[in-house]
Design a protein with these regions (language model features):
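Short, charged/small-residue-rich alpha-helical element at the C-terminal edge
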Residues: 11, 283-360, 370
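ABC transporter nucleotide-binding domain
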Residues: 231-323
Length: 370
């Protein structure tokens, strides 16, 4: 077995100069392929990009300005700009083919952008800086890409050696403890469930103590229990100060984990906190249900504080557009009581992040059909 490990390490060393590239499945960094070149970053004012929280000394952990990638005539993504603060969990959402994974590969120095500029872990994204950037980041791809006949420890040891970090054995032990896999260290990866393999892949991504961690669909194909385990690990990483760039199709996952989210559909459609995006896209509403229809709903709902309008939805349901539900709800309740209405329920309508996502993606589809 030890000879197999040595052979694998030697082969990996010949194939790549960086663990990040080794994880990509490519023989060489794309920065050297097909004549592609990075665009020299241009200086911009701090106000030109959308900022995140937790920035240290005004410098974001990760930023992009007008970043784009084309493959011939096909646009993978275009004109993407954002700033992500240190220790922020940033969700990157979008339909299949929107450019999410290509964005991760670009920011991770695995392929070169064709337009725009970026900084990763505080370093400008240029050909000369690729190696230094990869020392500060890790990428966990959607597919774990483990050596199934090797044990968990042997898999991690291969990559710890590639990082050429001091005390690789200690790093492997620490990574195993971080993902709660110390008791499975000697198990062959081929014997593990998909959820446990994802945890091994996450442990591998932590071997170099990354400042920025890219997680590409980390819970894809996992059952709810395994996905919850990954969520708890992400929460722990957030508390330790790691900046996390998370792509996912699970909108409830993004809503639970992310400080802010961006929705990409080739171009960036929106960016912000989930609550702020809901407020921007949807009016706040109160829904009232009565036992019998109101005889004069217009009089009942007239001139109430923070109530901007109303409509009847069926025989006994009334939907009120409100600017502030905490002010409107008591006023609406008093008005209904004074009118002698038998109220069955009154409550605020809540829109989910999925509602925001579908609204924006449907807008794009309608625009294409015009």
């Amino acid at each position: 077995m030890i000879y197999l490990i040595r052979w694998l390490i030697g082969k990996l060393r010949r194939r790549t100069t960086s663990p990040a590239v080794a994880l990509s499945g490519r023989d060489e960094p794309a920065v050297h392929a097909r004549g592609e070149r990075f665009v020299t970053p241009r200086k911009v004012a701090a106000s030109d990009a959308v900022k995140g929280d937790g920035e240290v000394g005004g410098a974001p952990a990760l930023s992009a300005l007008g970043l784009g990638k084309r493959f011939g005539d096909r646009v993978a993504f275009d004109d993407v700009s954002f700033e992500i603060g240190h220790g922020e969990v940033f969700g990157f959402l979008g339909p299949n083919g929107a450019g999410k994974t290509t964005t991760v590969r670009t920011l991770g120095t695995l392929i070169a952008p064709t337009s725009g500029s970026a900084t990763v872990a505080g370093i400008a994204l240029t050909p000369d800086n690729g190696v230094e950037i990869r020392r500060r980041i890790s990428i966990m791809p959607e597919s774990p890409g483990l050596y199934l006949r090797l044990s968990v420890t042997e898999n991690l040891a291969c990559f710890a050696d590639l990082y050429e970090a001091p005390n690789p054995g200690d790093r492997v032990d620490r990574a195993l403890r971080a993902v709660n896999l110390a008791d499975r260290a000697s198990d062959a990866c081929g014997s593990l469930s998909k959820g446990l393999r994802q945890r091994v892949a996450l442990a591998r991504a932590l071997l170099n103590d990354p400042q920025v961690l890219f997680l590409d669909e980390p819970t894809s194909g996992l059952d709810p229990v395994a996905a919850r385990d990954v969520h708890e690990l992400i929460d722990a990483l957030r508390r330790s100060g790691v900046t996390i760039f998370l792509t996912t199709h699970r909108l409830e996952e993004a809503e639970r984990l992310c400080d802010r989210v961006a929705i990409l559909n080739t171009t960036l459609r929106t960016i912000g906190r989930p609550d702020d995006l809901r407020d921007q896209l949807f009016a706040k509403t109160l829904t009232v249900r009565t036992l019998i229809p109101l005889s004069e709903p217009g009089r009942v709902f007239a001139d109430l504080p923070a109530v901007d309008g109303w409509r009847q939805d069926g025989a006994r349901d009334y939907v009120l557009a409100v600017s502030d539900s905490t002010l409107a709800a008591p006023a609406v309740t008093r008005a209904l009581v004074q009118a002698g209405a038998d109220v069955l329920s009154i409550g605020e309508s809540h829109h989910s992040l999925e509602d925001v996502y579908l609204e924006l993606i449907n807008e794009d589809e309608e625009a294409r059909r015009r």
